[in-house]
Swiss-Prot record:
Quaternary structure, from the entry: Heterodimer with pof4/ela1. Component of a CRL3 E3 ubiquitin ligase complex consisting of a cullin, the linker protein elc1, the substrate receptor pof4/ela1, and the RING protein rbx1.
Protein name: Elongin-C
Record's subcellular location: Cytoplasm; Nucleus
Chief location bin: cytoplasm
Amino acid sequence: MEKEYVRLISGDGFVFILEKEIACLSGTIRAILNEGIFSEAQKNECTFPDIRATLLEKVCEYLHYNYRYKNQLDIPKFDIPPEMVLELLVTAEYLEA
């Protein structure tokens, strides 16, 4: 079966391409893509005008990390730069990631 991909677009125009299964670990992204009423679902694309690329990139890294190490016993540390912590917390809360 061929993997399905989605495009996540930051407010400053950067595009991140993820497997849909991984992107949908975010409750918000899953809701946007799985509701047929959103045009984003038709295009497999989500635009986040209020999220900068540096934050969206870190969220994408975390979604991959979460997918890879889910149900593992030996999980490496996920590093977050201290200057990014507060903004990333707000972003993760919004994305339910």
